[in-house]
Regions:
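The canonical Cys-X-X-Cys-His
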Residues: 129-141
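Extracytoplasmic c-type cytochrome modules immediately beyond a signal peptide or single-pass transmembrane anchor
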Residues: 23-128
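Sec/Tat signal peptide C-region and signal peptidase I cleavage site
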Residues: 17-22
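Positively charged n-region of N-terminal signal peptides that target proteins for export
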Residues: 1-4
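Bacterial N-terminal signal peptides
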Residues: 7-16
Length: 142
């Protein structure tokens, strides 16, 4: 019963997020920039991560992050070609790249913890990742 209540609460909260995300996706240009594509996949992976944490299901955490990793390769190619323009502080591209590399390193730690079933470590890394999201968005996103 307790799991059902938690699942219902999580579903309701995520429904609101999904509705906003769906609206953004409708308004996204067809040839969206790779950073935005990666961020949307990361958003989906994070929603799954939170549900997996709440339901104590470490086995469900890893898979969505593989899509994020594949998208990162496209982002890196676009960065190398100079095709990425940051909405804010675009003159600090090296710092953006450094923060991104640190973030993806933490994602690897998250996956390792989930493979071991260490949900305390998953929770700790999740907090660090979320802090990284907020810092990066504050610095580089409008």
């Amino acid at each position: 019963m307790k799991k059902w209540i938690v699942s219902a609460a999580v579903s309701m909260a995520l429904s609101a997020v999904v509705a906003v995300h769906a609206e953004e996706a409708k308004n996204a240009p067809a040839a969206d920039n790779p950073v935005k594509v990666e961020m949307r996949l990361l958003n989906d992976a994070f929603k799954n991560l939170l549900v997996s944490l709440i339901l104590n299901n470490p086995g469900a955490i890893e898979e969505p992050f593989h899509e994020v990793h594949r998208a990162k390769a496209n982002t890196e190619k676009a960065l190398e070609k100079g095709e990425i323009k940051l909405p804010k502080n675009s003159n600090k591209m090296k710092e953006f790249i450094h923060m991104d590399e640190q973030f993806h390193g933490k994602l690897e730690a998250l996956i390792e913890a989930s493979r071991k079933g260490d949900m305390k470590a998953v929770q700790d890394v999740t907090h660090k990742l979320l802090n990284g999201c907020v810092q990066c968005h504050n610095k580089f996103r409008n």
